[in-house]
Amino acid sequence: MKYRLILATTGCVLFITVMAGVSWVEAEPQDFSKVPVKGMVTMIDLGAKKRIPCKMMAPIMEKMEKVYRGKAAIVFIDVWENREQAGRFRISSIPTQIFFDPEGKEVYRHVGFMGEEAIVAQLKSMGVE
């Protein structure tokens, strides 16, 4: 199965920035090795397409993609379809959002629905305007 990759998440499909200026890229699941994106603040949202909180976050993530394109990578990983990623990122509940600095170091972790204001505030605290 192929996944859509982009700078931010929309809905609950995998989206990732591989490099500034790239909007859409097709990739296989092994490309999760590029997450977190080196050299860029990265937000990973781990959840499942069929979960209500993911569906609620979809329009927020669409907006985040537009606002932060080229400034931050916002990645969604469906852990029901990619169970190994749940272990890799040590999650015990979904949704979980993890923020990484440009060096790939985890800076902040949140469990549960995360609204737009909270996402914007966290990105801003990490220097992303």
Protein language model features and the residues they cover:
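N-terminal targeting signals for export/organelle localization
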Residues: M1-A27, E129
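A short beta-strand-turn-helix
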Residues: W24-V41
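Structural micro-motif
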Residues: R90-I98
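Typically the conserved alpha-helix immediately C-terminal to a functionally engaged Cys/Sec
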Residues: K55-V67
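Thiol-based oxidoreductase modules, predominantly thioredoxin-like and allied folds used
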Residues: L46, E65, G70-R83
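Non-catalytic, surface beta->alpha helical segment in thiol-disulfide oxidoreductase systems
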Residues: D101-E129
